[in-house]
Regions:
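Short loop/turn elements that flank and shape the SAM/SAH-binding pocket of Class I
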Residues: 6-9
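Alpha-helix C-terminal capping/helix-to-coil transition sites in glycosyltransferase folds
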Residues: 11-13
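N-terminal Rossmann-like NAD(P) cofactor-binding module of classical short-chain dehydrogenase/reductase
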Residues: 16-18
Length: 172
């Protein structure tokens, strides 16, 4: 296991990588990997914003690499079967879909700033994001709720529901 992904990208024995980092790293990590000759799969969301998404497309073309982004529900046999039933007309002509999330999330509170814990390379973790004083509010799962690192629940959970709706309607 490597703490610095660039060491993995430099390894000529590796053909492809899967990127499952906080969202703010997705684009730069994928571009570095493609520049190093790797094909790339990135977990949702593919990028932190639209501009970065366009950069990923350009990089895949420039380096002639395969780039894929996805959500795990696409791999569910039950969901695949449900989508097939929709497309076969089991419930009629589907013209609209709504994705809903009913998931209570506890308040993460304000943990304030503190010294960086031993073993965490905070400069590397922060990467392309704006450097801020370390707070436990920014790491582990909590990074989702800060724009510097995540996309809130839209980029965390909403993307699953949106993808299901688009897939079911055969528009994405």
């Amino acid at each position: 296991i490597e703490q610095d992904m660039r060491k993995v990208f430099d390894d000529k024995k590796i053909d492809a990588v899967s990127i499952a980092t906080p969202n703010h790293w997705h684009t730069l990590a994928a571009i570095w990997a493609m520049a190093a000759g790797k094909d790339v799969y990135v977990e949702k969301p593919g990028s932190h914003n639209m501009f970065e998404g366009r950069m990923l497309i350009e990089a895949a073309k420039k380096y002639n690499r395969v780039f894929q982004h996805g959500v795990q529900l696409r791999s569910s046999l039950a969901i695949q079967e449900a989508i097939k039933h929709l497309r076969d007309g089991l419930i009629g002509d589907v013209y609209m879909a709504r994705g809903l999330v009913f998931k209570w999330r506890p308040d993460i509170g304000d943990k304030g700033t503190e010294a960086v814990p031993e073993g965490l390379d905070y400069d590397l973790w922060t990467g392309p994001a704006e450097m801020k004083p370390f707070s436990r509010n920014y790491v582990h799962y909590n990074w989702h709720w800060h724009w510097n690192y995540g996309n809130g629940d839209v980029g965390n959970q909403g993307i699953h529901e949106t993808d299901l709706c688009m897939w079911g309607l055969d528009v994405g």
